[in-house]
Amino acid sequence: MTRVTPLDKLRVPIGGQEIELQQIDYDGGGISLLRTRIREKSRFTVFEIDPQTAELWGRALLRWAQAQEPA
């Protein structure tokens, strides 16, 4: 049975989307994946990424956030 572990849940203040992060561990073992679920009203976007992609994406998000003017 696939194991799903909730990691975090966020709500975007502008737009109201819900972002849910989960760790996915499959029965057969191997690599764990990060599932990202974005809910926009009744529409869902779901994708799973490997640790290396998650690290690159996370760094890109941090670079962008740090370059923004404080609110």
Regions found by a protein language model. Name each.
Residues 1-71:
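Positively charged, low-complexity terminal tracts
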